[in-house]
């Protein structure tokens, strides 16, 4: 994870949880990908294969994963991807805000990948820190090249996109908006927003003359009022003299 993504990670509140909603297992994966020793933090705050396994358990239900992560350890990302990819459950990945770096690899495990409004996906080459002599650095370069090739295979397997195009995306650290991710084929759909409730104004037309005529007819029938003798009629109602 590069410095830019580390800064993003500090702004993403960790939340790793599961719940059953409408007979579907909904798993929230919000936080960095890896093990706590990478970041000196709590184990329950990190996305990794073992954590995801514990959340899925022996469930046979369809799974919805709400993913928000700046990435982290590429090997944990690949391990988590492979675990989810091998499940018999139907898995939907919803990118709620960000799926970057190793998290974008996890996203590829979805039978369906859905981008929420305003969300983004980012893919890039693997990175690491190395030290030693030139032979050590060459070994690290070779390792990074093989990791990148493996990453390309994951994206190509899921999307069917040409490997050369994906390699170009990785080398350029490419960011995709939700719409671009769907357009380029690395996601299946945009999440539909609930339709706003339509305000319907009921117009009531009142026929004032008809109401007045009914009132007059009522008093005429009950009190013997004649419209031509209003004073006499009112006297009957209120007990006045005729």
Tell me what each language-model feature is.
Residues 1-94, 98-102, 110-242:
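N-terminal organellar transit peptides
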């Amino acid at each position: 994870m590069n410095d830019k993504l580390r800064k993003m990670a500090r702004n993403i509140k960790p939340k790793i949880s599961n719940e059953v909603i409408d007979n579907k297992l909904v798993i929230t994966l919000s936080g960095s990908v890896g093990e706590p020793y990478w970041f000196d933090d709590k184990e329950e705050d990190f996305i990794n294969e073992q954590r995801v396994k514990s959340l899925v358990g022996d469930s046979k239900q369809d799974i919805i994963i709400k993913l928000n992560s700046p990435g982290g350890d590429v090997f944990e990302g690949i391990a988590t991807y492979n675990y989810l990819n091998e499940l018999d459950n139907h898995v939907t990945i919803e990118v709620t805000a960000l799926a970057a770096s190793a998290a974008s690899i996890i996203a590829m495990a979805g039978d369906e990948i859905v981008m929420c409004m305003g969300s983004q996906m980012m893919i890039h080459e693997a990175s690491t820190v190395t030290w030693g002599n030139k032979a050590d650095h060459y070994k690290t370069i070779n390792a990074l090249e093989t990791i990148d090739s493996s990453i390309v295979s994951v994206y190509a397997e899921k999307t069917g996109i040409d490997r050369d195009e994906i390699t170009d995306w990785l080398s350029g650290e490419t960011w995709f908006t939700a719409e671009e991710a769907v357009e380029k084929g690395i996601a299946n759909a945009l999440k539909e927003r609930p339709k706003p409730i339509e305000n319907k104004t009921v117009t009531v037309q009142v026929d004032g003359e008809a109401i007045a005529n009914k009132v007059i007819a009522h008093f005429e029938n009950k009190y013997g009022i004649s419209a031509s003798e209003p004073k006499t009629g009112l006297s009957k109602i209120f007990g006045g003299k005729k």
